[in-house]
Amino acid sequence: MRLKPIAVDDFCAVRSLANVTFSPAGASACFTMSQAKKEKNCYESRLYLLKDGAVRPLTGGGKEASFCYLDENTVLFAADREGGKEPSLSSRFYKIALDGGEAELAYTFPIPVSQVFPLPGGDLLVTGSTFPGFENLYTGDKKLAKAYLADKKENEDYEVVTQLPWWWNGGTYTRGAYESLFYYDAKKKALTRLTGVGLAVSDVQLTEDRKTVYYSLLDVSVPRPAYFGGADLYRMDLTSRREEAVAKSRTDFEIATYALGRSFLLLLAADGKYGMNTDCDFYKLDYETLAVSPYAVYGESIGSSVGSDIRHGGGRAMKMDGDVLYFISTRFDSAGLYKLENGAVAPVMVRDGSIDCFDRRSSKMLLCALWDMRAQELYDGTGRRVTHLNDAALRGKYVARPEVLNFTALDHEVHGFVLKPMGFTPGKKYPVIFDIHGGPKTVYGPVFYHEMQYWAGRGYFVIFCNPTGSDGRGAFMDIRGKYGTVDFDDLMAFCDAALAAYPEMDRDNFFETGGSYGGFMTNWIIGHTDRFRACASQRSISNWTSFYGVSDIGPDFSEDQCGASLWPDAEKFWQHSPMKYADKVKTPTLFIHSLEDYRCPVDQGYQMYSALAAHGVESRLVLFRGENHELSRSGKPKHRLRRLNEITGWFDAHRR
């Protein structure tokens, strides 16, 4: 069969799976399935049910994502099916029986609610929004709600900033809102506040008997909440409503998360040895005495940091079964499933690719994974594929298989990959695109990446690697104070190795692109070498000094990654800023930036573009309204198409 190339809009054919969850007894599993809709320029998400080996849709509204099982036969999910035109704060949850019937309204809350946790007798634990100055909106007082909406309308043209960070990527100005924990009395249809005003709740977990709740608390009433310093762990007896501190974060013991075991609690905490990117070790906490003791030294990444542009949504990365912890961890270039038992870590399911989320119940396992260069599917605990939801998306298409290309640079190995162009003929010359990942604490792995496959289908070699600073290799990720040095050397040496290994690569038609950290490196590269025919810098960093003051992670991330404080070490910031070297640039460069990117704000793109334009360098800046740092992964479908067409068109236009 003659294969067709991957099309620029083929990401719209891919279905993204997330939030895999077993029913209480494990007889069924529910998950979300999302898909980009090009004509509607949006994403639609629905709940699907896997039972007895068959998959069927459970909801049809197109906006369902958050859900939980109420019991073995009933799923509760968030949706807004009332379609009210008037502004409202309320949120609604519906329940649907798995054996048929229409969804029916189950709960209406007077505030935005993000999570619900069923309790015995029909009551709920709820995490919902608290708004400063209107802390009692949860009571359902209609006059108070009206006053809040009127105040919001009155002040919609103004932003008053009193905290750091003052905005979040993917959102807007913080405005001081935070999550609180509430108890919902189903008979009275009333919420009761459980956690204090000015204290943000996260990572809520119920004990198996549902009598005690654990949660992380962070004081957000202060001008600079410690978002990057770990939170404190608390618990509350739901009968007495007595709250007590369980464990506190310190500079050398930053609590990232935790898991509730049968006889002890597991803490995941980092000692800060490698700054804010330090990986966690495991600690054991006694339920009675609250004594904390070391359980297992790990120092590897938790969760999947394997990059791809065909995911939409998340899911569980760790779960306790008795006193055994099952967790996803990124090692080298892949994310596998491991277990921690009796203080020792052992592999459970490790294959090339990425396990993105999982669930385990009654010895059953379901994994959502990117394996075998396929889009996401569900697999059982033996690795057997149990769904075929994405077969049609790639059927009859050329999918380049990544060929491993490793080499030794100084005292370490650099791991990389090569995708051959469609129709590759030995001895024929082909243009090359070098793609650099973000992070920098992420990895490229052997998984399906739409943009790379699109370029391979258009006749390009695509090469990519994991330089110093990448995840999956412990301390290898520590690049503090070294940006633009050893990483730059690794990247350039990888290009040399690729050209030597594949004589079909056309060194005169060599292109480069990257986003976020990859955008930083693009900006750095064009100021330090002219080897690339043209480059495309995406959502980049160009100036650490200005980044400090405008990014949602600016003060913390910039000082951590530069390995210095802006005061008195401003020269160190400038030394590692691509803007310092912008007068050396000769390479034609395209800049892609989103106007609502608050992680690497648009001023970073403005600065590099202005510098190049002022020095007469061919350059182009393309800005996207209504998009943020996630443009390439979850931006509006038409915007994603425009972005990829801009980059590809830039390279095509500069080919000799």
For the regions a protein language model found, what residue spans apply to each?
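Multi-bladed beta-propeller domains
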Residues: M1-L17, L50-A65, P87-L89, I96-P112, ...
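Non-catalytic accessory segments flanking enzyme active sites
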Residues: A18-T21, E159-T162, W167-W168, T172-S180, ...
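Blade-terminus and WD-like Trp-Asp/Gly-His loop motifs, strongest in beta-propeller folds
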Residues: T21-S28, S66-T74, V116-G122, V204-T212, ...
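Residue position within the beta-strands of beta-propeller blades
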Residues: A29-M33, V75-A79, L125-G128, V213-L217, ...
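Short, solvent-exposed loop/turn segments at conserved positions within beta-propeller repeat blades
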Residues: E39-E44, G84-S90, E135, T172-A177, ...
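Predominantly five- to eight-bladed beta-propeller fold
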Residues: S45, T130-F182, Y227-D232, C280-Y283, ...
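Cap/lid segment of the alpha/beta-hydrolase catalytic domain
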Residues: L389-D508, G515, G549
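Active-site-proximal cap/loop segments of hydrolase catalytic domains
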Residues: P467-R656
